Amino acid sequence: PTVDDGRPTDPERTLWVDMTLITVLTTLTIVPYLAASIQAPIPEYVAALVSSIIMVFSLLLRRDHPGALMALLLVGGLIQLIFVPFPVLSIIAVPIASYAVGRWTAGRQSRIILWLGTIGAILGPLRWRDTLAADYDSSGTPWVMWFLATTVCLGLVVTPYAVGRRLREAALIESQ
């Protein structure tokens, strides 16, 4: 007997879902940085634009090539970590990717996203700390802001992964 992980069987429907997702995310996460880069072409905005393009369009690989998705997401995240001192809207790609890797990747390989996501959830908010806490006194507020941002970022990695894993397990059990 073949084991089915529940992948969609209607290519036309998945194409429409993918195109809708990319169109919405492009509008929400790429267009603002494109406009900002045109108005004020500073390196931070250009890096935010480039990383957003990489992260959003990598989601097209989520069902068939989750490993490539993780690699491209890592590249986009590293660009943000190195060049952008503020949170970028395209981090919304992270929970979508985390779910996809949990859902469509077998075994231990799927847990790589948890390690990468945990590192990103710590380093990203650490990079943003000065920007997020710019209007607060330095007594302890910056570290509270970092802790809260880190907790939210960890939740955006772990929760979708767990949901994707459970759905994968349920589909595999049902197919047996």
Q: Where is each model-derived feature located?
A:
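N-terminal signal-anchor/first transmembrane helix of integral membrane proteins
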Residues: 1-70, 125, 131-133, 150-151, ...
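Subset of alpha-helical transmembrane segments and adjacent helix-loop junctions
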Residues: 43-46, 66-72, 79-94
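A short hydrophobic/aromatic micro-motif that marks alpha-helical segments and, especially, helix-coil
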Residues: 78-80, 121-122
